[in-house]
Every structure is written in C-alpha cells, then in structure tokens.
C-alpha cells in the first residue's frame, strides 16, 4: 500500500514497499518523475530538482 509522506502544490513524495517516489504536479496532473529510491537519496534528489524540501 502506498503512503504519501509529503505533498504540496508542486510535488508529492510517496512511499511504496520501502521505496520512495517523487511525483511532480503540473496543471493538476501528476507526472511521475522518479523511480523508486532509498530514503537516504530522497533529499539529494529533491535538492537537485530545485525543491527546497527537507524530509
């Protein structure tokens, strides 16, 4: 079962089977922008993508 661990008007971070995914929200559509990654890599991914989010 998936669990949303963070969501705002630009991005949603989802956990699924101990992997994390980042979905970008554009014009009301969710665009899958990451493949399952470890939690340790999540903050680096968000920073590199230009988001000021720290989990």
Predicted regions and their residues:
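Acidic, low-complexity, intrinsically disordered interaction modules
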Residues: 4-55
């Amino acid at each position: 079962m998936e669990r949303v661990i963070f969501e705002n008007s630009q991005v949603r971070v989802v956990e699924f089977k101990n992997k994390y995914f980042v979905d970008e929200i554009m014009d009301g559509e969710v665009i899958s922008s990451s493949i399952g990654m470890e939690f340790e890599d999540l903050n680096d991914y968000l920073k590199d993508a230009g988001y000021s989010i720290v989990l």
